[in-house]
Amino acid sequence: MALGSNTKFYETPNHPFQGERIADEANLIGRYGLKNKEELWRAQSELRGYRREARKLLGSAGEHETESEEFLARLKRYGILNEQDQLDDVLSLDVTDVLERRLQTVVYRKGYANTPEQARQFIVHGHIVLDDARVTRPGMTVETAVESSVGFDEHSSLSDELHPERAEAQE
């Protein structure tokens, strides 16, 4: 690996043993089917970056108007913010807002899998397509425009409606 290339895309907690934080992390890992705490910390770092950018843009109100519009448009495109939300609303985001936009969670919420863990397995094994392209990264952030194109690969055995591993229709 080249010198100076950043291989760590998250920050670990400052204090290693805080019971409440550890319990909250375990709850989120279980609810979203994350592989390990590193994935959760990556989402927290992503959220931290969004907040940092919002504070920077709020501090220089008026000077960087196009940058703030582009920043808001990006967050709205990913579905992290609603269409009516403003720059102030970025500061009130929670890590669950970021985790809800992961491909793994979208596949589970759309009813293609019974559990988030099963959704992760379907993605990693190449059964899920996004815009007719096979995707094998469960942590990928899904844009709202392409969310409707999530489905099973036509060459996958799971594309059969009667496959035993297919999820029941969730209401």
Swiss-Prot record:
Record keywords, A-Z: Ribonucleoprotein, Ribosomal protein, RNA-binding, rRNA-binding
Pfam families: S4 (PF01479)
Region (Disordered): 148-171
Biased composition (Basic and acidic residues): 152-171
SMART domains: Ribosomal_S4 (SM01390), S4 (SM00363)
Superkingdom: Archaea
CC per GO annotation: small ribosomal subunit
Domain called S4 RNA-binding: residue spans: 101-165
NCBIfam families: PRK04051.1 (NF003139), uS4_arch (TIGR01018)
Subunit architecture: Part of the 30S ribosomal subunit. Contacts protein S5. The interaction surface between S4 and S5 is involved in control of translational fidelity.
Family: Belongs to the universal ribosomal protein uS4 family.
Role, per record: One of the primary rRNA binding proteins, it binds directly to 16S rRNA where it nucleates assembly of the body of the 30S subunit.
Name of the protein: Small ribosomal subunit protein uS4
Source organism per UniProt: Haloarcula marismortui (strain ATCC 43049 / DSM 3752 / JCM 8966 / VKM B-1809)
